């Protein structure tokens, strides 16, 4: 039996493939390569010595989904596919909804037709909006989102919850990520955004490698210890391992299940800059600019539920996040483009 990984050539997807293959799972990947590269799948093979079966296509395409389910014995789906960056999605709400929401509906419909009853969904802490309670637990209010990306994730969560009620055989696991950073320790796979990065760590590392002249710090007047936004940063390998734990716990475990995946510790933008400088001996020039629409002051998790119910907790600290980020970037200054 195989696991279908949508968006498997992307940043989190490729790291999850490595961990799945290390456990000898059979993997099928569907990715449209709109914000990823097939080179990442070649690198995954270099790391693990194992291949995945790859289909290039879109989750909106029912024909390719039916082909995948017909040609492979799929028992579960890990669903990463969708537009990711807060910045890009604020400019085109319709495209965000079409890809992230409609695509997820199509995927789940075709899963159910094929009698595939387990899905692990890549959600986000952005569903909490501007949280009134810190640290954030899973029972905190959701839906007061501040950008289209968060809204799309919230909508898919609600759709999955309602689908479980309509199709009680379905096991839907929602993983609410906090801010993923770092790269595989080999330096072969990592985050490779198109254009100017929207996320902090690739922005920092591209300044370090000389691709960008300075870091833009979005907002210096938040109510935090240094005026910059505070987030919960989690190593991407720890995040990947959380998917394996969720899948093992809830395979064919009918119901709707929600977990935060974070460290439980918040760091500011300037904390992260200083940590990168200390870990790698590189100075990062920066300039404080206007706040980015949709950003909030503070967001970090209470990850106890994942520890208690999944047996999952983070193992990689801030220094390793910084070293692994730089190891990836310095060895791949142009990402997967050569």
Curated annotation (Swiss-Prot):
| GO biological process: one example | galactose metabolic process
EC category = isomerase
Instruction: Give GO terms: molecular function aspect only.
Output: UDP-glucose 4-epimerase activity
Q: Which reaction does it catalyse?
A: UDP-alpha-D-glucose = UDP-alpha-D-galactose
Q: Does the keyword NAD apply?
A: yes
Keyword presence, Isomerase: yes
Instruction: State the EC number(s).
Output: 5.1.3.2
Query: Do you know which Pfam families this protein is assigned to?
Result: Epimerase
* Cofactor list: NAD(+)
**Which pathway features in its UniProt record?**
Carbohydrate metabolism; galactose metabolism
Residue sites binding substrate per the record: 124, 149, 179, 199-200, 216-218, 231, 292-295
GO CC, sorted alphabetically, is: cytosol
The residues annotated as the active site are 149
Q: Which residues bind NAD(+)?
A: 11-12, 31-36, 58-59, 80-84, 99, 124, 149, 153, 178
Q: Which UniProt keywords apply?
A: Carbohydrate metabolism, Galactose metabolism, Isomerase, NAD
Q: How does it assemble?
A: Homodimer.
Per the record, the similarity remark reads: Belongs to the NAD(P)-dependent epimerase/dehydratase family.
Q: What biological function has been recorded for the protein in this entry? A: Involved in the metabolism of galactose. Catalyzes the conversion of UDP-galactose (UDP-Gal) to UDP-glucose (UDP-Glc) through a mechanism involving the transient reduction of NAD.
Q: Write the protein's name.
A: UDP-glucose 4-epimerase
Q: Report the source organism.
A: Mannheimia haemolytica
**Native organism taxonomy:** Bacteria, Pseudomonadati, Pseudomonadota, Gammaproteobacteria, Pasteurellales
């Amino acid at each position: 039996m195989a696991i279908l990984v949508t968006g498997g050539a992307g940043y989190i997807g490729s790291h999850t493939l490595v961990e799945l293959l290390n456990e000898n799972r059979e993997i099928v990947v569907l990715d449209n390569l709109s914000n990823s590269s097939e080179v990442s799948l070649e690198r995954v093979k270099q790391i693990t010595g194992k291949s995945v079966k790859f289909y290039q296509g879109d989750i909106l395409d029912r024909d390719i989904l039916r082909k995948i389910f017909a040609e492979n014995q799929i028992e579960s789906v890990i669903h990463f596919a969708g537009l990711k960056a807060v910045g890009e999605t604020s400019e085109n709400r319709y495209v965000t909804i079409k890809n992230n929401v409609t695509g997820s509906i199509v995927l789940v419909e075709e899963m159910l037709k094929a009698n595939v009853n387990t899905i692990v969904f890549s959600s986000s802490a952005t569903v909490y909006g501007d949280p009134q309670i810190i640290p954030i637990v899973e029972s905190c209010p959701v839906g007061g989102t501040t950008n289209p990306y968060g809204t799309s994730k919230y909508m898919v969560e609600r759709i999955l919850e309602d689908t479980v009620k309509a199709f009680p055989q379905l096991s839907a696991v929602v993983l609410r990520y906090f801010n993923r950073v770092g790269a595989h320790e080999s330096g072969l796979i990592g985050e490779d955004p198109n254009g100017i990065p929207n996320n902090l760590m690739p922005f920092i590392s591209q300044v370090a490698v000389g691709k960008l002249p300075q870091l833009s710090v979005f907002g210096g007047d938040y109510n935090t210890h240094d005026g910059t936004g505070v987030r919960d940063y989690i190593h991407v390998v720890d995040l990947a391992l959380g998917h394996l734990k969720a899948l093992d716990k809830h395979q064919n475990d009918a119901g709707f299940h929600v977990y935060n995946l974070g460290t439980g510790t918040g760091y500011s933008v300037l904390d992260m800059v200083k940590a990168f400088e200390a870990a790698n001996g590189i100075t990062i020039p920066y300039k404080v600019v206007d706040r980015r629409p949709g950003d909030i002051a503070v967001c970090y998790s209470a990850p106890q539920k994942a520890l208690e119910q999944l047996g999952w907790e983070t193992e990689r600290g801030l220094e390793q996040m910084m070293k692994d980020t730089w190891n990836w970037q310095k060895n791949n200054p142009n990402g997967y483009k050569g």
